Structures are given as C-alpha cells and as structure tokens.
Amino acid sequence: MAANSTSDLHTPGTQLSVADIIVITVYFALNVAVGIWSSCRASRNTVNGYFLAGRDMTWWPIGASLFASSEGSGLFIGLAGSGAAGGLAVAGFEWNATYVLLALAWVFVPIYISSEIVTLPEYIQKRYGGQRIRMYLSVLSLLLSVFTKISLDLYAGALFVHICLGWNFYLSTILTLGITALYTIAGGLAAVIYTDALQTLIMVVGAVILTIKAFDQIGGYGQLEAAYAQAIPSRTIANTTCHLPRTDAMHMFRDPHTGDLPWTGMTFGLTIMATWYWCTDQVIVQRSLSARDLNHAKAGSILASYLKMLPMGLIIMPGMISRALFPDDVGCVVPSECLRACGAEVGCSNIAYPKLVMELMPIGLRGLMIAVMLAALMSSLTSIFNSSSTLFTMDIWRRLRPRSGERELLLVGRLVIVALIGVSVAWIPVLQDSNSGQLFIYMQSVTSSLAPPVTAVFVLGVFWRRANEQGAFWGLIAGLVVGATRLVLEFLNPAPPCGEPDTRPAVLGSIHYLHFAVALFALSGAVVVAGSLLTPPPQSVQIENLTWWTLAQDVPLGTKAGDGQTPQKHAFWARVCGFNAILLMCVNIFFYAYFA
C-alpha cells in the first residue's frame, strides 16, 4: 500500500508565476465577494432562508448550481481519466441526466413542493408514516456524503493541486476545506447557489481554453480517433492486450457482454442510479426546492441539462487526447512505470487532465485552470456541506430535540459542517491507500450497490398508492443486505492487474455493476410490493398531495405572491419550458445517434 501513497508522487518542477498567483487570488476574492453579496440578499436567520434560500431563487442560478454541484473535481479528474482509459462511452453518465432532470422538474418537484417538505427523508416520512425509514435514509445519506462524495472530491482536488504544483497534500486539502466551509457556514444555500453560478462560468471558460489547445496539438477533431488508437506506451506486458486502446473507443453503445460500459447497463441500470442522484438525493433536489415557482424549477433543470452536454467535448475528449500525447504516463500498464508517473501501480489514467494543464497551458492560463479545479472542488463540497447539515438538523436533531428553536437549529447546522470537515480530513489516509486506476468507475460501482433500493422506494411511493411503510422498510433492508454484500466482496476481491487471470466470484466477474443495479432495483421493488400487499394499506393522509395521482389541482405550484406575474404570463413561460424540454430531448437523441 505504501507504494500508492500520495507522498510518493513525482513533484513537478513547474513553479507558479506571478500571473498565475494573481489569477488564483482574483478567483478567491470573487468567490468570497459573491458569497457575501448573496448572503446579504437572502434571509439567513430563518430555517427556510438558510436551508432553502427563502424559496426565492430564479432559474439561471438553479441551473448553474445543479450543473456545478454534479461536476466536482472528482468528476473532472474521473471523467477525463475514464475517457483516457476507455473512450467516449463514459459520456453516457452525463447525457443520461437529461431525461432524469426533466423528470425531476415535471414529476418530482411538484410533489415535493405540494408536500411542503425541506428534506427528502421528510417526504418519505409523510408518505409512508413512521420514523424508521426517514432516519434510515438520513443516516445513509450522511454516510454516503462523507465516505464517497466529500472524500472523493476532496482527494481528487488535492491530488490535482499536488501533481500540478507540488504543494503539501494535507496543507492544500485543509486550506481548501477551510475556505469552502467559511462561506457555506456564513451564507447558507443562497451563498452556495450564487457561488456555484460564478464557478460554473469559470469551469466552462477554462475548460474551453484547454480543449482548444488540446485539439490543436493533435491536428483537430478529425485526428482524434487515429491519435487515440496509436496511444500505446513504449513499455508493455508481454502476451497481453491491456496496453492497447479499445477498438470501440469512439462508440457510445457497446456490447452487452464484452463492453466495459454495456449499452443495456447504460440505458437501464444508469437510469436507476441517475434517478436516485437527480430526483431523490438531498444535494440536488434542494436546489430545485429553492425555486420561486415551478417554471423556474423547470427552466433550471433545462439549463442544467444543456450544460451536461458539455463534458463530452470539454473533459472526456481532452482525456483521450492526454493519453494520445503522453501514452507512457497516462496509458502506462507496467507497475513500475505507473509508480514513476503518478505514484500508483494500478494505473495513471486519473492524471490525464492535470497532465494536460501542466504541459499545454501557458503562464497565467495555468493559474486559471487551477482556479477551475478549485472551483469544481468547492462547488461540490459547498453543496454537500449545506445539504448534509440540512439533513442532520431537520431529520435527526429535531427528532432528538423536538422543542429546539430556530436559533439552535441554525447553530447545529453550522456545527455539523465543522464535524464533516473533521471526518473528511481523517478519511484522507484511507483514500490514499485506495488509490485506483479509474476514480469515476469506482464511484459509480459503489453507487450501484447502495442507490437502487432508495430509487425503488421513492418511485413506488410517488406512482403507487398502495405502497406502505412496512413494504418500503423491508424493501430497503433487503436491498441494503444484498448491495452491501456485493460491495464487501468487491473490496475483498479487486479486479486483477494486467496479465493475471480473473479469479473473482461470478457475481463480480460475470455481472457488470450496471446490470447488478437493475437486478437490485427489481429485488427491492418486489419486496416493497409484496410487503405492501401483505399488510394494511396506507392511510388517506399518507396519500393526499403525496403521490402523482393524488396531487391536488389547487396547490399553489405556479405564481408566487408578489413576483409580478399574471396567470397569463405564467402560462406563457410554462409553454416556453415545455418547448425547450422537447428541443432538449431532440438534441440529446441526435448526439446519442451520432456517436452510437
């Protein structure tokens, strides 16, 4: 394990210029200024103001925040790394979000708003009754936040800074966490959403500049396929083919049996996982719940969906170019060569993006790209910090102290962020020892073992009136047992390195994690249905305004009092949103067909 430690990484000789330092300083100054400005605009002294931005956010910061929250530094490094390792197909994880984001705005948000909830476990408690499911989901969400989302983004961001600049790994981690937490604690959700909007702009501009320079290095887009096919390292392992780029690298749809990302799993399994992330996860849904009305929530989802089209060209293709330009480092397969290149024997695809930054970006622009990665890291972390504190405060603390006042709840919410920082920093050594070849695939594999049961409970709760608490609870437990079993087996039986036979159990070697997600969803759903049919039906109070079929028509999901909109204007913008949703799906289908 010591060989994989970050402390063993090669320290680059590149030093920051004065221009780079100025760019990074200006970035942080803008970030703090926007956070302070947005905090002054929103009321932070009420639970609704701190946790839901006073339910008065407009569509453009919501859309930008939805995008930025999902594009943390882990995704920047992970997507580029997976693109370098396997080609374009990983873009399906981004493009699939189009349909699920539309489902969020058109199906789930109306129900969440009409139920007058602040957190998603609160909705589950209203829909099913009882406290055990709500507590289960709150604790599970907090654990997932700490051990996957926060830790993964933190590790990837710190790895980027360490590789590019040679800064002390722990110092860069703690400083970034401290600044991130400062304006999250001070400003609540409004500060998070407005700083996300700023960081989205920085991320896109910086990534566009790097993409243009990367394509220029290989002679344009027309040369991408040929350049990638020739990205073979000079040192290989005899009698193996793992050093060769995939022959289907330019294909989105891959064979269900031999493909690394089979089209069946990317269509069905990924949709189940994406529904959990976009429609039932507190970090994401909280942004839509802050909308001033339903049209703004819909427009925010549409904007985020358009932005989710960009990573194919701005992250994944540059990752492929990085392997073409630096095959001995990014595409290494010999353990000793990988150890030299990035400090990890299992592979170095994760350094694809930072390698491009350090080799291609000139003085000044290098500082911009470092700011981009810091922006991605901080966008993701601020979102998770705020949403996790909301979960703990509203679902756990109020359960323990039902008489706690608003001042106490706000204080606890801020203290939870401090606690999350401590746990996350303590988890860094574990992540260092778990340094893997493809960070993004690891993240998705973990999600496939834990998310499908939650998706099943939410989907059945929304669309099936008969679903009750007993069925939902035992569906979650059955799914947790099966999913956790596979997860433990996966940690105990890692994939074999290049040139060694695969001796893992069949459930790991023969069943792709995306296919497993489908099976786990079906199992959990079957238990929910069986348990519900064998026990008494839910009470009417658990159905009214809480399912798609019983949503009251007179619930004020439209115009907000005092916003100056007439019913006619509201209906006009509703039609505009509907037209854009159809156009968006057409664009998405075109891209899928073009790269299929």
Swiss-Prot record:
The compartments listed are: Apical cell membrane
Topology term for the membrane: Multi-pass membrane protein
**How is expression of this protein distributed across tissues?**
Predominantly expressed at high levels in kidney. Very low expression is detected in testes.
Q: Which residues lie on this side of the membrane: Extracellular?
A: 1-15, 94-99, 171-173, 222-264, 322-355, 431-443, 493-513
Chief location:
membrane
Q: Which residues lie on this side of the membrane: Cytoplasmic?
A: 37-72, 121-149, 195-200, 286-300, 377-409, 465-471, 535-575
Family annotation (InterPro entries): Na/Glc_symporter_sf, Na/solute_symporter, Na/solute_symporter_CS
Glycosylated residues, per the record, are 4, 96
Q: Which residues carry this modification: Phosphoserine?
A: 141, 145
The UniProt keywords, alphabetically, are: Cell membrane, Glycoprotein, Ion transport, Membrane, Phosphoprotein, Sodium, Sodium transport, Sugar transport, Transmembrane, Transmembrane helix, Transport
GO-annotated molecular function: D-glucose:sodium symporter activity; fructose:sodium symporter activity; mannose:sodium symporter activity; solute:sodium symporter activity
Pfam families, alphabetized? SSF
Annotated transmembrane regions: 16-36, 73-93, 100-120, 150-170, 174-194, 201-221, 265-285, 301-321, 356-376, 410-430, 444-464, 472-492, 514-534, 576-596
Tell me the residues on which Phosphothreonine occurs.
Answer: 148
Q: Which Gene Ontology BP annotations are present?
A: hexose transmembrane transport
Entry GO terms, CC: apical plasma membrane; extracellular exosome; plasma membrane
PANTHER family in the cross-refs? SODIUM_MANNOSE COTRANSPORTER SLC5A10, SOLUTE CARRIER FAMILY 5
UniProt record similarity statement: Belongs to the sodium:solute symporter (SSF) (TC 2.A.21) family.
Q: Which NCBIfam families match?
A: sss
Q: Which named protein is this?
A: Sodium/mannose cotransporter SLC5A10
This chain is encoded by the gene named SLC5A10
